[in-house]
Amino acid sequence: MAKINGNEIRPGYVIEHDGGLWVAVRTNTVKPGKGGAYNQVELKNLINGTKLNERFRSAETVEQIRLDLKDFSFLYEQDDALVFMDTQSYEQLELNKDFVGDRAAFLQDGMMVTVQLYEERPIGISLPDQVTLTITEADPVVKGQTAAASYKPAVLKNGIRVLVPPFIGAGERIIVDTNEITYVRRAD
């Protein structure tokens, strides 16, 4: 752990604040006409996801946390647990489905993920930014709606609904952004 000044906090930094671990989502340096400058920081709690806005003056110091990043391979799902394997030591890690959240639906056998660890305890997980999935259902194209960019709903193999362009049909493979849960492009 390293101490840093409040004005050195940048987006992506993980800090210890009020007894919890927080990641800086957004920062903004404010220089008011009267008084000293400060750093307005939007923080997100790594454990429960709550958000908090804090002001840090340059004279304040905070603990910057160094997270260990480990690569894991997704193995299988068992009840409410997701099982991953460390690619270095072959040890298995079991995480609750709630820990991964809605993005658990994107996990596929053998998919590589990065788990963020603090003192050997998992506190976050990063999935690949894009995955390739097959469309199981797509509404038919309605003729005459081509004047404006129109999208139609489609259901993916994992049950997630996304909006796709009219030329995409059932059975096609598309690339989906796992962060925004949006259509990116047709897969090759």
Curated annotation (Swiss-Prot):
Protein source organism: Mesorhizobium japonicum (strain LMG 29417 / CECT 9101 / MAFF 303099) (Mesorhizobium loti (strain MAFF 303099))
Function: Involved in peptide bond synthesis. Stimulates efficient translation and peptide-bond synthesis on native or reconstituted 70S ribosomes in vitro. Probably functions indirectly by altering the affinity of the ribosome for aminoacyl-tRNA, thus increasing their reactivity as acceptors for peptidyl transferase.
SUPFAM superfamilies cross-referenced by the UniProt entry: Nucleic acid-binding proteins, Translation proteins SH3-like domain
The gene coding this protein: efp1
Pathway: Protein biosynthesis; polypeptide chain elongation
Stored SMART domains: EFP (SM01185), Elong-fact-P_C (SM00841)
The protein's name: Elongation factor P 1
GO cellular component: cytoplasm
Entry's Gene Ontology molecular function annotations: translation elongation factor activity
Keywords recorded for this protein, A-Z: Cytoplasm, Elongation factor, Protein biosynthesis
Compartments, as annotated in UniProt: Cytoplasm
Listed Pfam families: EFP, EFP_N, Elong-fact-P_C
InterPro entries for this protein: Elong-fact-P_C, NA-bd_OB-fold, Rib_uL2_dom2, Transl_elong_fac_P/YeiP, Transl_elong_KOW-like, Transl_elong_P/YeiP_cen, Transl_elong_P/YeiP_CS, Transl_elongation_fac_P
Gene Ontology biological process: peptide biosynthetic process
